[in-house]
């Protein structure tokens, strides 16, 4: 087995730390060389069979199982069922066994922003003032925290997720699976515009027709006007590695001067965005608040709607008829209400207060109507993402089992055909699995305590558990 070797020294831990044990990671001098390697490359002759025994197994979709077992063979779930029914061939070839109180699929957050700047919500201006290297460092830390907290997948809907995903996938950093839109597409004077800056400054940095020599077109926002510009904008995001396309189809809260009730982009522009994405086997996710934008996004063929603050029965029936996913993002609203708008410009704070009640009624209405829902927070990697499960239950009206389904089994729908088989504990699915020390069906807030997440497997590899170091290495024998 080839490994990048690091020594991990526990540091002083604050009782209030959201991270659990904090480590100082430094390279081992014996392992230093000039060739960058993946963190872990397993040899082909390893057995790679893991058996996990669980007092309670929550499959993601379906009823929980008592006294269950799950077998991971390589990266795939090979068996799920009663521990008495484990095929003997796995018992003979077991590499490792674990016994845990609760086992379930890894969590998803389906509405992240990989901005990595220190003041994202202040009218987006800090995004242009923050060096991408600083953004990358913050995002690396946040992605590590996310995995430790039980989040094995993120959908990024405006940010550097495409670039961070490459670093995670090649083993440079540790984090969840990341499915990114790249930049969110906005019209001029739309939700992705930066009204506090001169138009030339914004268009020079984020305008789709203005990529400079050596410029990757890799920012969190992309301004495009007219059918040819939006077509190019979609193609640029796919070139960058986008797995889903994000469009601002109405005004928003954080954009200082637009109106959340007004639709953005013309029907022709939206149609081209959806068609161009579909040509590359991608779905389109639409930011929408007001009904005009909601209906335009539905008509254009968007398959995932975010926020949907001013919806009614007509909207819910259309979403069910067309198989459209709803991601409510209640957390960001609750967080700002609780802080009295701390960090927001006054215009954004006024808009958030104006739509908060309507958004909650819409969320509750969607749940009662049976709309398919996935959970997302509209926050940054490593943030308080587990709050969304609590709000789904306590504010939205879901049962804990329904909230878990929305955070696991439903979540891959948010990236359409680009999603692998994951989000459920089923045979043939990727082994993105977490273990808990307490039952979330009895207390949904258990996800907010990182220590309650005792084990995390991503793609069959154990990244958190007894004897596992901060980089997913075997801390008991790091030289293997």
Swiss-Prot record:
Activity across pH: Optimum pH is 6.
Subcellular location: Secreted
InterPro entries, alphabetized: Amidohydro-rel (IPR006680), Metal-dep_hydrolase_composite (IPR011059), Metal_Hydrolase (IPR032466), Metallo-dep_Hydrolase (IPR051781)
Impact after mutating residue 160 to S/G: Affect substrate binding and carboxypeptidase activity
Stated regulation of activity: The Zn(2+)-specific chelator 1,10-phenanthroline inhibits the enzyme activity.
Primary location class: secreted
UniProt superkingdom: Eukaryota
Biotechnology annotation for this entry: Detoxification of contaminated food is a challenging health issue and ochratoxinase is a promising enzyme that hydrolyzes ochrtoxin A, a mycotoxin demonstrated to have nephrotoxic, immunotoxic, genotoxic, neurotoxic, and teratogenic properties; and that occurs in a wide range of agricultural products.
E.C. designation(s): 3.4.17.-
Record keyword Nucleotide-binding present: no
Catalytic activity: ochratoxin A + H2O = ochratoxin alpha + L-phenylalanine
Regions crossing the membrane: none
Pfam families from the UniProt entry: Amidohydro_1 (PF01979)
One MF annotation (Gene Ontology) recorded for this entry: hydrolase activity, acting on carbon-nitrogen (but not peptide) bonds
Listed cofactors: Zn(2+)
Keyword Hydrolase attached: yes
Cross-referenced Gene3D superfamilies: Metal-dependent hydrolases
GO biological process terms held by the UniProt record: ochratoxin A catabolic process; proteolysis
Entry note: thermal dependence: Optimum temperature is 66 degrees Celsius.
This protein's UniProt keywords: Carboxypeptidase, Hydrolase, Metal-binding, Metalloprotease, Protease, Secreted, Zinc
Subunit: Homooctamer.
Free-text comment on this protein's domains from its UniProt entry: Each subunit of the homooctameric enzyme folds into a two-domain structure characteristic of a metal dependent amidohydrolase, with a twisted TIM (triosephosphateisomerase)-barrel and a smaller beta-sandwich domain.
Family to which this protein belongs: Belongs to the metallo-dependent hydrolases superfamily. Ochratoxinase amidase 2 family.
Protein name per Swiss-Prot or TrEMBL: Ochratoxinase
Organism this protein belongs to: Aspergillus niger (strain ATCC MYA-4892 / CBS 513.88 / FGSC A1513)
